[in-house]
Amino acid sequence: MEALYTDDQIFIPIISDYGFKATFGNEANTLFLRKALQALIKSDTPIKEVKFDKNTFEGVTKDGRSGIFDLACTDENGNHFIVEMQYGNAPNFVQRMKFYSLHKFNAVVKKGKFDYSILEKIYCVGILANNINTYEHFHNVSNLRNEQGELIDDQMTFVTVELDKFTLQEVDCQTDLQKLIYTMRTIHTVTQPTQFPQFWNEEWLKVAIDELDSRKMTPDEKASLEILIARNAESVKAESKKIKEARESENLVVKTEMVINAISMGLTVEQCAKLANVSSDFVLSVQRQLSAN
């Protein structure tokens, strides 16, 4: 799923850095965030208000490293929500969610002076562009359960959404969760108002869509967006370079092993080079390293 904004798009992708902050992180109007959170945790109880928390924590590891998540807030009942949007590949994303949640859990326990009977609930929500689970469902809610699947504790809840697994069409979207994920997957592809689904007229989604409409942005907002686009492009370029270098390094290791094996078999320099698809100089370099060792 493409999350980077381009000049020909009318609507900014929600999963982009700017889009996430403009919708989920909209402190001036929290309607979208409240409805989205209610849908994501599958609650029948409306969230009336939210208060944004500091979204970093410092000095929690021995070497001073700190964690950072995209959004942290608390509702009117003291329930805590942590939301992170992940665009790139993150095979260990669940471990990161546990790290965030357990840090919050420790803070809640200390705040309650270790009275475990009054702990507020913690919901850690991870929204991912790519897949990390083997399950077929795009939305998963996880609690502590026994081997029979019976609930042991729901004080801490983990929610994962994998956008790539969502395949419902507009006409199939009936629940707020389905409407939310459909919007996140498609809003940046819309070029004409006639393409709007009927449910995009619902107030909570209109609030978010208006924030994503590049035509309604102030000059300052457009300037901020351009800065983020430049940063995103640079990040993508840097990440691509790292991936390329890693692949080249891995390829070099494989070729070196092939040359070493070929040398041990008594093949000539030319034969080793042809077998490993490398130059004769490369083979000679490996030979010198072997001799030195």
Say what each PLM segment does:
Residues 1-220:
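Conserved single-residue anchors adjacent to enzymatic active/cofactor-binding motifs
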Residues 1-9, 18, 81-86, 182-293:
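Short, charged alpha-helical interaction segments and adjacent helix-coil junctions
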